[in-house]
Amino acid sequence: MRKSYRIKSEQDFQTVFENGESVANRAFVIYVLPRKQNKHFRVGISVGKKVGHTAVVRNRLKRYIRAVLTENRDRIAPDLDFLVIARPYAHDFDWEKTRENLLHALNLAHVIEEMPNKEEK
């Protein structure tokens, strides 16, 4: 995922966090804010120390999240800024479990409209 698809500044994070709608499942919280001036969606990813006490665990989960978003970028509306915040429940997820739970949360938030079949990969 290119850096232009990422929310980096604290001000942008705060704007989405304070003004966006939130949806959650056990593993992820999604904050969504529609933005008309976007050429493509932007995403911020947060995996705190409560999720994984070591950087290895946190970075692996962030890598999985970015991979799921890259895999599904054609299905994500271009006029959105959204945050993906991992909850401690996700600390030991493998690729498949991360994909399944993140797609469920994105579907609940109407970032992705339909769920893919389990056979699709």
UniProtKB/Swiss-Prot annotation:
<keyword id="KW-0255">Endonuclease</keyword>
<comment type="function">
    <text>RNaseP catalyzes the removal of the 5'-leader sequence from pre-tRNA to produce the mature 5'-terminus. It can also cleave other RNA substrates such as 4.5S RNA. The protein component plays an auxiliary but essential role in vivo by binding to the 5'-leader sequence and broadening the substrate specificity of the ribozyme.</text>
</comment>
<comment type="similarity">
    <text>Belongs to the RnpA family.</text>
</comment>
<dbReference type="InterPro" id="IPR014721">
    <property type="entry name" value="Ribsml_uS5_D2-typ_fold_subgr"/>
</dbReference>
<dbReference type="InterPro" id="IPR020568">
    <property type="entry name" value="Ribosomal_Su5_D2-typ_SF"/>
</dbReference>
<keyword id="KW-0540">Nuclease</keyword>
<dbReference type="GO" id="GO:0042781">
    <property type="term" value="F:3'-tRNA processing endoribonuclease activity"/>
</dbReference>
<dbReference type="GO" id="GO:0000049">
    <property type="term" value="F:tRNA binding"/>
</dbReference>
<keyword id="KW-0819">tRNA processing</keyword>
<dbReference type="Pfam" id="PF00825">
    <property type="entry name" value="Ribonuclease_P"/>
</dbReference>
<dbReference type="InterPro" id="IPR000100">
    <property type="entry name" value="RNase_P"/>
</dbReference>
<dbReference type="GO" id="GO:0030677">
    <property type="term" value="C:ribonuclease P complex"/>
</dbReference>
<protein>
    <recommendedName>
        <fullName>Ribonuclease P protein component</fullName>
        <ecNumber>3.1.26.5</ecNumber>
    </recommendedName>
</protein>
<dbReference type="GO" id="GO:0001682">
    <property type="term" value="P:tRNA 5'-leader removal"/>
</dbReference>
<keyword id="KW-0694">RNA-binding</keyword>
<comment type="subunit">
    <text>Consists of a catalytic RNA component (M1 or rnpB) and a protein subunit.</text>
</comment>
<keyword id="KW-0378">Hydrolase</keyword>
<dbReference type="GO" id="GO:0004526">
    <property type="term" value="F:ribonuclease P activity"/>
</dbReference>
